[in-house]
Amino acid sequence: MERKERLRAGIAAMGPDISETAQDRLLAYVDLLKKWNKTYNLTALRDEEKMIVHHLLDSLTLLPYIEGAQTMLDVGSGGGQPGIPAAVCRPDVQITLLDANTKKTAFLRQAAIELGLDNVRVVSGRVEAVSDVRADVVTSRAFAELADFVSWTAHLLKDGGYWAAMKGVYPQGEIGRLPQDVCVEKVQRLDVPGLDAERHIVILSKR
């Protein structure tokens, strides 16, 4: 299956309304990942089909959970997942991509420029040291244990905001280790077309 058809079929199976222009931009992002990966080691994946599944479709499972947001922070953004696909599909949301690795943030800045993502800001640094970002939604994909994630980012969450942590298998142990002042709003299993591995999203808020 041609890559454009594979992406379109995956999106159709998942349900979000994503324009042809946005889909083309998502594939252009994959091209940038492949180009920069040779030097910067942004992803262990080399196969384009796997990139579409793991980096695009997997990231797009976040979209229903940022519907009401105006601002989003992607912590430990790495090669830009889920932040860049989210930014492509939600140009109305101001998205900050944060990573401590300067090579990765250099890529993220270039990707935002080349993809024309005016709604993206890139911040280089450790999350604990960042103080000039506030977001309605703070998200991450496989960044850290939940207790650490909320502890390190609580100062970056707006009042009334929430965390959206993208995880693999159901993180029962991690949920049990969350601090008492954090409320588990929802744990939802995610279906990613073409991906056999388990995926869950954990929605958390301050009590």
UniProtKB/Swiss-Prot annotation:
Main location (coarse class): cytoplasm
Keyword check for Cytoplasm: yes
A Pfam family of this chain: GidB
EC numbers on record: 2.1.1.170
InterPro entries: rRNA_ssu_MeTfrase_G, SAM-dependent_MTases_sf
Residues the entry annotates as binding S-adenosyl-L-methionine: G76, Q81, V127, E128, R141
Alphabetized UniProt keyword annotations: Cytoplasm, Methyltransferase, rRNA processing, S-adenosyl-L-methionine, Transferase
An annotated GO cellular component: cytosol
Listed name of the protein: Ribosomal RNA small subunit methyltransferase G
Lineage, highest ranks first: Bacteria, Pseudomonadati, Pseudomonadota, Betaproteobacteria, Neisseriales
